[in-house]
Amino acid sequence: MLPATEAAKIYQTNYVRNSRAIGVLWAIFTTLFAIVNVVCFVQPYWIGDGMDTPQAGYFGLFHYCIGSGMSRDLTCQGSFTEFGSIPSSAFKAASFFIGMSMVLVLSCIGCFALFFFCSTATVYKICGWMQLAAGTCLVLGCMIYPDGWDADEVKRMCGEGTDKYTIGACSVRWAYILAIMGILDALILSFLAFVLGNRQDGLMSEELLGDKSGNA
């Protein structure tokens, strides 16, 4: 059998290796989450026309395109830089929260550089809080967005049966679904970041105890 000190060193080596592998996967999935967040923010496919809608078209957070009359040609309007052009105050609020989520997760990626200068555990915990805040912003954005479905522009596309949280003849599109999936992603990543941060704290404590026993 191996001496206790050697067994402890082997365990610690495997522990560090596994933590690093999980940390790399966490960083990769954080980057993918950032891409998803950006796509959800910029793509205008949150809701769209259906078989029975009066007009063709689709809506995003701030950009939307609607047909006119019998023509299938779409007229597009709306820009985040022109906040007043967004057709509903609910859409404006949703745009703000989804935009904040995007900024937070991109800032989290920027914090990866801190791994070279700061305690690994501290960086993980900072990123964990950022990801949790990003997930919270996504929740708020996704919950507020349907409150704007009673806007005149949405009713023109989806029919008079459209109202707050009632989509009428339209349907939910992929960008909205992706944003909802992003909430779960953010929660899992933030939980993993806190776990990794606490594991790093535990590893540092073990190293300090090992140094003390070695000196003794």
From Swiss-Prot:
Source organism, top-level taxon: Eukaryota
Database matches in Pfam families: L_HMGIC_fpl (PF10242)
Gene Ontology CC, one term: plasma membrane
Q: Where in the cell is it found?
A: Membrane
Q: Which UniProt keywords apply?
A: Membrane, Transmembrane, Transmembrane helix
Q: How does it sit in the membrane?
A: Multi-pass membrane protein
Q: Which residues cross the membrane?
A: 22-42, 96-116, 126-146, 177-197
Please provide the Gene Ontology terms (biological process) for this protein.
sensory perception of sound
Which InterPro entries does the record associate with it? LHFPL
Instruction: Identify the PANTHER family for this entry.
Output: LHFPL TETRASPAN SUBFAMILY MEMBER 3 PROTEIN, LIPOMA HMGIC FUSION PARTNER-LIKE PROTEIN
The record's comment on protein family reads: Belongs to the LHFP family.
According to UniProt, the name of this protein is LHFPL tetraspan subfamily member 3 protein
Q: What is the lineage of its organism?
A: Eukaryota, Metazoa, Chordata, Craniata, Vertebrata
